[in-house]
Design a protein with these regions (language model features):
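Charge-lined substrate channels and their catalytic hotspots, especially those that engage the 3′ end
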Residues: 1-73, 80-125
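Beta-strand residues in well-ordered beta-sheet regions across diverse protein folds
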Residues: 73-75, 145
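Short beta-strand segments
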Residues: 75-77, 135
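Polynucleotide-recognition surfaces of large bacterial nucleic-acid defense/processing enzymes
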Residues: 127-153
């Protein structure tokens, strides 16, 4: 499997500079940052991933509103909050373009402490996300939609 990645030009290792840069990223979410986002930490949010997954990069939420309508949320990890444009991590992730999932391994687009920890939408942790929130009728008619920065738990 490693040969497939090498033949496709996919780097197997991150540069030392990229690893060091990833370790310097602050892990605390500030109150200032929370105030700039729609707070969905009180909404039941869940991922749908294999049991052995570590990089939970997307999540869903669903709730019945008092009006009888439904609210559906689609949430994706806000990696852009942590990766500065033009920096080494940005350049290396651009070169990779994606994480590659093979039967025996995952070669991530970003170092594991970002993909599996900082930006992984793990249970019982506050995480920064981009979300699409859609309100629909029981018949599926879209009543409203909202797209923006959020924080989920």
């Amino acid at each position: 499997m490693k040969d497939i990645l090498l033949e496709a030009g996919f780097p197997l290792q991150f540069s030392e500079e990229a690893i060091e840069e990833s370790l310097r990223i602050p892990t605390t979410i500030t109150e200032k940052e929370i105030k700039t986002r729609r707070d969905l930490r009180g909404t039941c949010t869940f991922t749908i991933d294999p049991l052995d997954a570590k990089d939970f990069d997307d999540a869903l939420s669903f709730q019945l509103l008092p009006s009888g309508q439904y609210e559906i949320g689609i949430h994706i990890a806000d990696v852009s909050h942590y990766i500065e444009e033009g920096e080494t991590l940005d350049q290396e992730s651009y070169t990779r373009g994606t994480s590659v999932y093979l039967p025996d391994r995952v070669n991530p687009m970003l170092p594991e402490n970002i993909s599996n920890v900082l930006c992984s939408l793990r249970p019982l942790e506050d995480k920064l996300t981009f979300s699409v929130i859609v309100e629909i009728t029981p018949n599926g008619k879209i009543l409203s939609k909202w797209i923006g920065k959020t924080i989920i738990h």
